[in-house]
Regions:
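Acidic/glycine-rich phosphate/pyrophosphate-binding loops and surrounding catalytic core
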Residues: 1-179, 183, 195-198, 206-208
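Short secondary-structure boundary segments
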Residues: 188
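Short hydrophobic alpha-helical segments of the AMP-binding
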Residues: 201
Length: 210
């Protein structure tokens, strides 16, 4: 039937965590029906306890039911990323380390997933391949070594673009130190090797572990 029935719906958390995506859920509900009223009790990046009411939605029952699954999917996905990020952020709170996101995101959802990482207290790495140059193992092999790869890149890169080199051995790391590489990615290294690299970081390069 076309008869409109107004209902009130409550969105509650079912575990402790960090909220992300409240602005998106409002857009989802209003995209289906501009007359739907969404009241957020919290803000993005807030910590939330299990059982807390996060938001209240008032409007036509058909409109709310049509939008709820998409809205909750966004809220759950983004809050999940923010909450998981926050666990790692808290575990390194007394260090100088930072938690960074990667470019390995869900197709079409990169912007909101990177935003969710920031809600959890993390930082964003490159947004895309053109935001900085990462020399990976394939590039090093193709060029015939780290030094040659750096030479090719330096001759062709835009001015002011940062270069990062991915290494997976201590030897490669020490070579990067000798070549004054300012950003070094330690790829799949054990905690023991990472610790060795930190001790040998004589030039004060920024190190990332992946």
């Amino acid at each position: 039937s076309n008869k409109k029935t107004n209902i009130e719906a409550s969105i509650n958390s079912n575990q402790d965590g960090v909220i992300s995506g409240l602005g998106i859920i409002e857009l989802v509900f209003k995209n289906i029906d501009a007359n739907t009223n969404v009241t957020n009790h919290l803000s993005d990046c807030d910590e939330v306890k299990n059982g807390t009411e996060i938001a209240r939605v008032i409007g036509d029952s058909h409109s709310i039911l049509a939008a709820e699954r998409v809205a909750l999917n966004f809220l759950g996905h983004m809050s999940g990323i923010a909450s998981e990020t926050n666990k790692y952020v808290k575990s390194i709170a007394n260090t100088k380390a930072r938690i960074l996101s990667t470019r390995k995101t869900t197709p079409g959802l990169r912007a909101i997933e990177k935003y969710a990482v920031r809600c959890g207290g993390g930082y964003n790495h490159r947004y895309g391949l053109d935001y900085g140059i990462l020399i990976k193992d394939n590039h090093i092999k193709a060029a015939g070594g780290i030094e040659k790869a750096l030479k090719i890149i330096k001759n062709n890169k835009p001015y002011m673009t940062d270069i990062e080199v991915e290494v997976d051995t201590i030897e490669q790391f020490l070579e990067c130190q000798r070549l004054d590489v300012r950003y070094i990615l330690l790829d799949n290294m054990s905690p023991q090797y990472i610790s060795e690299c930190i001790k040998n970081n004589k030039i004060g390069a920024i190190l990332e572990a992946s």
